[in-house]
């Protein structure tokens, strides 16, 4: 029987002298989450976030839980507005080694990303160890990023605020989260623009993960463990001006000015660590 994991939102101070109120505690049981069945996320609580009405505010803030005794991240909680969004370029986050960080390449791509709980485009956090967990590429790009983009686009288009909370859920003392609970509700329009509550699975199709340690292996057709593939480079096209990277076949590459194009062969993880972000069109 899995343990009931309280979403204890006792939020630590991120910046010295900055005060933040803890959000009400919410309990959520991983046993209530259906087993992964091929989709990156599942809707929770009829897509309604667990926020209390008293939490909705137009005052922007961001708070990140202190690491626990195992070095694991807890809840990240914010009221996202334009005033929190980054004004500068994304910086390297390679200095952070989140719990369970045992990274291996499969098919030329690293299994894990340093996943922002609250995406860089929302609050501009770079190498904040309280906001980075060990997460698969699949969870990061297919599961979390579409919801982050939804919130970012809404805030930029309306100048409204969005109450936003991401909670990693762990089974027992596992170092790698089984997934993350993502909640969001737009403030000024009373959830008309943004309203979701989803659980995103921390899985990678075709790869087995030992969540206790972060170790991984390739799964064969019959489920047998295969040896890890030899690391190999992948071809990308970089735009140093926008800090985006693309697949060579991406339509955006054709429109790129020659002086803004750099051909690159290497790992996706290295690009993310250097502050590049994937193109939203080709999703490399």
Task: Annotate each language-model stretch with its function.
Residues 2-10:
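Sec-dependent signal peptide recognition
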Residues 12, 130-133, 276:
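Residues immediately within or flanking Cys/His clusters that coordinate Zn2+
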Residues 13-17:
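C-terminal motif of bacterial Sec signal peptides marking the signal peptidase cleavage site
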Residues 19-22:
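Bacterial signal peptide processing site
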Residues 24-66, 234-236:
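N-terminal module-boundary/linker segments of secreted carbohydrate-active enzymes
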Residues 39, 46-47, 108, 173, ...:
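Intrinsic-disorder/low-complexity loop/linker signature
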Residues 50-227:
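Domain-level detector of nuclease and nuclease-like folds
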Residues 222-284:
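Mature, structured domains enriched in cysteine- and short glycine motifs
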